[in-house]
């Protein structure tokens, strides 16, 4: 039977999805299932790894059944995943010894402080491209080994395996035959040297983590093993995987130095491909691994904003100013400007490039004439201002002045926001026809790995732009508006 489709498994923080793409990179079928968020203590976030697997495997069955697709027609399955989330399981039984510790979880803060006290901060920055923060997997692994009874003894005996979610899914799909990750996920563990592309012995020693725990690192665009859907039908190749933000970068075909994308979700993630050069950031960004045009390792600068779409949820849920996120475009367009109002949504501090956990949200510039529309508009504009903060930092670090920004995520449907993003950055903003770019990136990697598609050049002919947003304000206005934003940010940090 002819191979007509590629399936992407998109394992996210709140739901597991499966998306089928045809040879023209069109979406054929989608299935999604949410799973339980666990909060056992303040600042702790966990998932049940078995529930993640159950939700992911069930949507895989469902997405094919819904479209009437036979497993013989599927060329490959690609994987993209929430990054940093940590699972440890028994090699012999496949049973997790503890819940997955999620990227958002802050329980390992004390371990990070111990590493800082040992003088490891600069070594971590130089060799992993990351900051010493509980966000990343390494300190989560140490916490499990230190706190789960008998875990360290089992690990020393080589009886346990660690994986980020990509590794866990491949292990389950291949029925325990394959223990593997890719460089984009490995680079988020705090244990991977992004220059030598190997596990870092000094950091393993500092965290007391046995090497036997860790997966083999294979290219993002390669075949890892095979699986059968629900144990039935013909074998399908599991091929191609990347962490969610790097998958989106590849899905947008940002495979050359200086190409960048911004994902507008709960927060915003802006990544710029820097090619074969790992650029050290002096402006609060992370240096991370990306995927090049032939599936090889490239590097990227990454900046994250904590409050993107979450700011709009706040308008809806806490202030009751809107009923639906889509209402914001209508209300924001009813006024010519914000009437001098700025919203700095530092509800949980500020992310890149400030990294200020103590900053708090604030509204500035309120006068008697300020109304609901001005506040809603200021909330939308805050997303674009924060993205400009990241872009400016990237320009300073890389020396590359961006001309075009590719965008994806839920908020890109908002034309007002996209136009203001173009205006305030003085950069053309490109919105793709298929906004599921994270899943598309996983599908592209899988399809390229098995020859379903020949090259990135072929994929470029399939990538359609829905709309171009061209900068439409003068330089003087741009400078004045952004100066107001910078002043507002400074005051939230005072």
From Swiss-Prot:
<dbReference type="InterPro" id="IPR018483">
    <property type="entry name" value="Carb_kinase_FGGY_CS"/>
</dbReference>
<keyword id="KW-0067">ATP-binding</keyword>
<dbReference type="GO" id="GO:0005524">
    <property type="term" value="F:ATP binding"/>
</dbReference>
<feature type="binding site">
    <location>
        <position position="244"/>
    </location>
    <ligand>
        <name>glycerol</name>
    </ligand>
</feature>
<feature type="binding site">
    <location>
        <position position="13"/>
    </location>
    <ligand>
        <name>sn-glycerol 3-phosphate</name>
    </ligand>
</feature>
<dbReference type="InterPro" id="IPR043129">
    <property type="entry name" value="ATPase_NBD"/>
</dbReference>
<keyword id="KW-0418">Kinase</keyword>
<feature type="binding site">
    <location>
        <position position="266"/>
    </location>
    <ligand>
        <name>ATP</name>
    </ligand>
</feature>
<feature type="binding site">
    <location>
        <position position="414"/>
    </location>
    <ligand>
        <name>ADP</name>
    </ligand>
</feature>
<feature type="binding site">
    <location>
        <position position="135"/>
    </location>
    <ligand>
        <name>sn-glycerol 3-phosphate</name>
    </ligand>
</feature>
<feature type="binding site">
    <location>
        <position position="266"/>
    </location>
    <ligand>
        <name>ADP</name>
    </ligand>
</feature>
<feature type="binding site">
    <location>
        <position position="313"/>
    </location>
    <ligand>
        <name>ATP</name>
    </ligand>
</feature>
<feature type="binding site">
    <location>
        <position position="15"/>
    </location>
    <ligand>
        <name>ATP</name>
    </ligand>
</feature>
<feature type="binding site">
    <location>
        <position position="14"/>
    </location>
    <ligand>
        <name>ATP</name>
    </ligand>
</feature>
<feature type="binding site">
    <location>
        <position position="135"/>
    </location>
    <ligand>
        <name>glycerol</name>
    </ligand>
</feature>
<keyword id="KW-0547">Nucleotide-binding</keyword>
<dbReference type="GO" id="GO:0006072">
    <property type="term" value="P:glycerol-3-phosphate metabolic process"/>
</dbReference>
<dbReference type="InterPro" id="IPR018484">
    <property type="entry name" value="FGGY_N"/>
</dbReference>
<feature type="binding site">
    <location>
        <position position="13"/>
    </location>
    <ligand>
        <name>ATP</name>
    </ligand>
</feature>
<comment type="function">
    <text>Key enzyme in the regulation of glycerol uptake and metabolism. Catalyzes the phosphorylation of glycerol to yield sn-glycerol 3-phosphate.</text>
</comment>
<dbReference type="InterPro" id="IPR005999">
    <property type="entry name" value="Glycerol_kin"/>
</dbReference>
<feature type="binding site">
    <location>
        <position position="84"/>
    </location>
    <ligand>
        <name>glycerol</name>
    </ligand>
</feature>
<feature type="binding site">
    <location>
        <position position="410"/>
    </location>
    <ligand>
        <name>ADP</name>
    </ligand>
</feature>
<feature type="binding site">
    <location>
        <position position="309"/>
    </location>
    <ligand>
        <name>ADP</name>
    </ligand>
</feature>
<keyword id="KW-0319">Glycerol metabolism</keyword>
<keyword id="KW-0808">Transferase</keyword>
<feature type="binding site">
    <location>
        <position position="13"/>
    </location>
    <ligand>
        <name>ADP</name>
    </ligand>
</feature>
<feature type="binding site">
    <location>
        <position position="309"/>
    </location>
    <ligand>
        <name>ATP</name>
    </ligand>
</feature>
<protein>
    <recommendedName>
        <fullName>Glycerol kinase</fullName>
        <ecNumber>2.7.1.30</ecNumber>
    </recommendedName>
</protein>
<dbReference type="InterPro" id="IPR018485">
    <property type="entry name" value="FGGY_C"/>
</dbReference>
<feature type="binding site">
    <location>
        <position position="244"/>
    </location>
    <ligand>
        <name>sn-glycerol 3-phosphate</name>
    </ligand>
</feature>
<comment type="similarity">
    <text>Belongs to the FGGY kinase family.</text>
</comment>
<dbReference type="Pfam" id="PF00370">
    <property type="entry name" value="FGGY_N"/>
</dbReference>
<dbReference type="GO" id="GO:0004370">
    <property type="term" value="F:glycerol kinase activity"/>
</dbReference>
<feature type="binding site">
    <location>
        <position position="17"/>
    </location>
    <ligand>
        <name>ADP</name>
    </ligand>
</feature>
<dbReference type="Pfam" id="PF02782">
    <property type="entry name" value="FGGY_C"/>
</dbReference>
<feature type="binding site">
    <location>
        <position position="245"/>
    </location>
    <ligand>
        <name>glycerol</name>
    </ligand>
</feature>
<dbReference type="GO" id="GO:0006071">
    <property type="term" value="P:glycerol metabolic process"/>
</dbReference>
<feature type="binding site">
    <location>
        <position position="83"/>
    </location>
    <ligand>
        <name>sn-glycerol 3-phosphate</name>
    </ligand>
</feature>
<dbReference type="InterPro" id="IPR000577">
    <property type="entry name" value="Carb_kinase_FGGY"/>
</dbReference>
<feature type="binding site">
    <location>
        <position position="84"/>
    </location>
    <ligand>
        <name>sn-glycerol 3-phosphate</name>
    </ligand>
</feature>
<dbReference type="GO" id="GO:0019563">
    <property type="term" value="P:glycerol catabolic process"/>
</dbReference>
